[in-house]
Amino acid sequence: VLLDVVAALAIVALAAFVLMPRPRSSIGAAELSGEAVRVSGEFRKGRAKALTTGSVADVRVDPGNKRIQVDGANPISIRDGVAMNWVTSDRCPIRGGTRALRFLADGRSCGGVMTPSASGREIELRVDWLTGRVEMSPK
């Protein structure tokens, strides 16, 4: 009888081990999209600040440390596993060793393209220099 109980418990333990969900080591499409939405929100926050204050507002992008910060606000950190590629024009100011995205009082910007990527997926965030509009599209 004891052997039957031990065998039954072993079978239940084996089934639980096989059926338990395992944490993923890679970033999925939904997580990458969520990070892209957070970054685009910071860009939009910078534009809104420039429009409401009537003065320039810089959004500092630090791809090496994976941090983004609107002037006067707390920085956000991009989660581990997400790489950032940041390209701007030469007209964008250098802040903290990298080019910042500058929004002018009328909403225009110096323009830039941020590409967060993970697990072979990329999402392109394009900030139009003329309108300051932020567009997000899979690459």
Task: Please identify what each model-predicted range represents.
Residues 1-10:
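N-terminal signal-anchor/signal peptide hydrophobic helix marking the start
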